């Protein structure tokens, strides 16, 4: 085990790493959450392939300053602050938090970062309304598949009509013979 200073340096390095890698970072006040609610929330984040952690405000401030963030972000590091990280789907952490807030009053949004840009509570709520990455991919694939499917139906209908016409000509020739 290292000294307390080394542990704090590790935590700062971890937070900096997560802050740099995440597409979405959301800061919230969790002071009204029960242990049971906190456990439920953490499970929801895991299910959404996101992370939810609590760091000391002083360590977050050090990390944010080292990454070049100013007081516009650091001012939110007051009181109990939890952090949600979204790596693959930038919408997932916002969806989880906003959805959770509908049934649990013990948590409130402070601010967030989307691709390194500071966003407000209203912008986080708007982000939560967007479709997830999976939904967008499904819609895109569906819209690409639809014209191909329609083309197959049109071509098979045309081919069927040609076969009927050829069959009619064949039957006419047989009747004449």
From Swiss-Prot:
Any one annotated GO CC term: large ribosomal subunit
Keywords, comma-separated and alphabetical: Ribonucleoprotein, Ribosomal protein, RNA-binding, rRNA-binding
Gene Ontology biological-process entries: translation
Function, in words: Forms part of the ribosomal stalk, playing a central role in the interaction of the ribosome with GTP-bound translation factors.
Source species: Thermoanaerobacter pseudethanolicus (strain ATCC 33223 / 39E)
PROSITE patterns attached to this UniProt entry: RIBOSOMAL_L10
Record's signal peptide: none
Gene Ontology molecular function: any one: large ribosomal subunit rRNA binding
Pfam families: Ribosomal_L10 (PF00466)
Origin: domain of life: Bacteria
Entry keyword annotation includes Ribonucleoprotein: yes
Taxonomic classification: Bacteria, Bacillati, Bacillota, Clostridia, Thermoanaerobacterales
Family under the similarity heading: Belongs to the universal ribosomal protein uL10 family.
Coiled coil: none
Subunit structure: Part of the ribosomal stalk of the 50S ribosomal subunit. The N-terminus interacts with L11 and the large rRNA to form the base of the stalk. The C-terminus forms an elongated spine to which L12 dimers bind in a sequential fashion forming a multimeric L10(L12)X complex.
Name the record gives this protein: Large ribosomal subunit protein uL10
